[in-house]
Amino acid sequence: MANCTCKLPEELLKKLSKLGNKMDSVSETVLETGGAIVLDKVRNNLQSVLSGESTGELLGSLGLSKVLLGKDGNHNIKVGFAEPRSDGKSNAMIANIIEYGKHGQPAKPFLKSAKRQSKKECIEAMTQKLEEEIDKL
């Protein structure tokens, strides 16, 4: 049987040891930074596809969730729509119709394009924020 030993760079080990028990609070801060960037891009894209007849209710319900711990132990943050609407319809349903269209109404994608457009900027901002948080410790 073969053995394999992996040695991490000393600098990385020092940074990881600094985090220690503060990993949860640091990861929340980092996720909120990335979530804010994606939220801004989704909001801008949604504004660009909405018609002048829009009530603004969908745009007003767009927001960021709290950072939650998933079943697998990963921290998650979500960009989404608050419920319910004043007319009884679901904001998620309205957003889905705008994103994918329906019979007689063409699709006006805003979520998929926001994800694609904000990915690089989000990763860079989260990386920078993580390094800032580690340096504070």
What is each model feature region?
Residues 1-77, 86, 95-137:
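Short, Lys/Arg-rich flexible segments
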Residues 79-81:
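Extended beta-sheet lipid-handling architectures
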Residues 88-90:
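Long, charge-patterned amphipathic interaction tracts in eukaryotic proteins
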